[in-house]
């Protein structure tokens, strides 16, 4: 199993609460639609970043497939213009 954690900072003029709700609404439903994606949640962060994405995958291969999956790429079009900074880390369990 692989854990995938991403911290994001949104652009300054973005409504943070609305953005987090939007991002969650397009990414969280991907669980069950993309093979190997076991869990995904979005939450507001409080450590200098605006929100955190936490997800679990069956394997490294599943994480790699998710990153280029058409449903994931389409979902990103709804919010990528809101992002300023992204920091990610993955680790095996």
Labelled PLM ranges:
Residues 35, 81-82:
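A generic structural signal for short, non-catalytic loop/turn and secondary-structure boundary residues
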Residues 1-51, 58-68, 89-93:
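Short S/T/G/P-rich N-terminal loop/turn motif that feeds into the first structured element of a domain
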Residues 67, 76-79:
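Short, flexible helix/strand-to-coil boundary loops that buttress conserved ligand/catalytic motifs
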Residues 73:
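Long, contiguous binding/interaction regions
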Residues 83-87:
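A short, amphipathic edge element
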């Amino acid at each position: 199993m692989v854990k995938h954690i991403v911290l994001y900072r949104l652009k300054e003029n973005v409504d943070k609460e609305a953005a987090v709700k939007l991002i969650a609404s397009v990414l969280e439903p991907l669980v069950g639609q993309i093979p190997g994606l076991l869990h995904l949640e979005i939450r507001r962060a409080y450590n200098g970043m605006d929100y955190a994405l936490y997800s679990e995958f069956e394997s490294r291969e599943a994480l790699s497939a998710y990153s280029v999956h058409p449903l994931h790429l389409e979902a990103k079009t709804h919010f990528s213009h809101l992002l300023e900074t992204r920091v990610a880390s993955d680790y095996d369990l």
